[in-house]
UniProtKB/Swiss-Prot annotation:
It comes from Homo sapiens. This is Small lysine-rich protein 1. PANTHER family: SMALL LYSINE-RICH PROTEIN 1. Residues 1-24 are annotated as: Disordered. InterPro entries: SMKR1 (IPR037760). Residues 1-20 have a biased composition (Basic residues).
Length: 65
């Protein structure tokens, strides 16, 4: 049986500066066009953009068979 060599430690991720995500304008024409196709009404629009309200019904997770 051949002898096992030493396993060196691999190069880990460098802990440099993280790149910040650019601030996205949710009112830009491209965002509005996207919202036009995915939202069905104003409440849905606000929900998709992250503006939830306290009494909102919870969505069903997964699909039922």
């Amino acid at each position: 049986m051949p002898a096992k060599g030493k396993k060196g430690k691999g190069q880990g991720k460098s802990h440099g500066k993280k790149q910040k995500k650019p601030e996205v304008d949710i009112l830009s024409p491209a965002a509005m066009l996207n919202l036009y196709y995915i939202a069905h009404n104003v409440a849905d629009c606000l929900h998709l953009r992250g503006f939830h309200w306290p009494g909102a019904p919870k969505g069903k997770k997964g699909r039922s068979k």
